[in-house]
Amino acid sequence: MSENRTRERNMFSFQSHRFLISQRFPESVPSSREIAQSVRDLTRRHNAWFKDCIPLIASENVLSPASREVLNSDLHNRYAEGLPGKRYYQGNIVFDEIESLCEKLAKEVFSAEFADVRPTSGTVANLAVLQAIAKPREKLTAVAVSDGGHISHAKIGAAGMRGAKIYNYPFNEKDMNIDPDGAKKLIREVKPKVALFGQSVYLFPTPLEEIKEAVEEVGATAWYDAAHVLGLIAGKRFQDPLRQGMDVISGSTHKTLPGPQHGMILANLRKEGLESNIRRGVFPGATSNHHLHAVAALAVTLAETKEFGEAYASQTVGNAKALGQAMHELGMDVLCEHLGFTESHTIVVDVQEHGGGKRVALDLEKANIILNKNMLPWDSDPVRPSGIRIGVQELTRLGMKEAQMSEVARLIHRVAVKNEAPSKVKEEVVAFKRGYTKVHYCFFEGEEASDYP
């Protein structure tokens, strides 16, 4: 882009911002108090809007009332570095108990020998693991972003920032999964330091047991990014990576595990030094303070997962399959029909003949149906991909079951395929969603999900 074009673009952005401010405060330049009040009003507006939306983003969920309560506690104002009993700050006497309990719950829920609950996000957890198990310029194998791999596994993401030399597994586009024979061949040829598995478009379990022989043969550390499926693993409805040859699991804690926006690392301790390396990778490596309020909310979520996790995971997968079937019966091109569409919370739909993923996602947003465009393996343009990604974990959390998936499919179809006016469909979306605004699969079940002062 030329210097003049860049200047014009920046000026347009500035003028647009001034226009929006002037529309909200037409009389004069707003005071700081007015701006703060505006933010509060906009936040209330967002809450009210989402209460009337069908949320289908595969990487989101809603907190339980108990988790939300501790997230909003004084812990938000406090700071901690290090581990319980070995802090660099005073004032953590009570929080030490909370963090220790959270780690204990994580190990119990996932049957793990080790847990670290300090990473502040999934990508921060990935950075910590990378620092723990790989040096810059060492080799790493992973799923390509175009095949559903996460951006943090790519050259432009966390793995690239760490300096890893990245090699992508051969991918079976029809089955939307790693090709196990191709993966074994790649691992034996490349001899990576790290074999990384896991995706952000994750329909089916990775064939870990077929691949682990090659991983062990070359002495690689086996790492599984479970961000999208952590709750399904906890609920015994996906796969069990720590029993299938994986050394380390990382993940965010706010997708199918319906906790706060945070991160977590789990491990088996078969490799010497792994525990201490991960601890150093987390602090001082990838974090300083680790968001005490989120650790407390995660502890509550894990306690709820022990009690409700299996039922929640089972219903989530059942809903995803039902939605895939309903959309397929309406004539939409849902991927992997021959495999039952999915074994996770996610389905993927090719909407290229209906204008592509970007157009469909924008039109659905106007109808209060919230999902995202997504690249499919045969796409080359991430801005205008041919697919959409749909996750049902939040609808499940709000009490929907298989019967409601038919109505969700019908509403999507009317906008995406029949090209009905989004404003017309929006009225039905709002009426439909009003019956599903309370949180389920948790303590204090039945309280509102989107209450805001």
Model-assigned labels for residue ranges:
Residues G273, H354-A361, L398-A403:
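Short, conserved charged micro-motifs
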Residues K51, T120, H293, H338-H345:
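Short Gly/Ser/Thr- and Asp/Glu-enriched loop/turn motifs at secondary-structure junctions
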Residues L56-A58, G281-N289, R397-G399:
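A short glycine-threonine-serine/GTX helix/turn-capping micro-motif
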Residues P84-G85, F114, N289-L292, G309-Q315, ...:
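Flexible, glycine/charged-enriched surface loops at secondary-structure junctions
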Residues S2-L101, E213, R434, V439-P453:
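N-terminal glycine-rich, Lys/His-bearing helix-loop that initiates the first secondary-structure elements
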Residues N10-Q15, I21, G318, P382-P453:
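PLP-dependent enzyme catalytic core of the Aspartate aminotransferase-like
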Residues S16, I21-F25, L101-D333, V351, ...:
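Conserved PLP-enzyme active-site core in the AAT-like
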Residues L302, A313, V317-A361, L371-S386, ...:
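Conserved small-domain helix->loop->beta segment predominantly found in fold-type I
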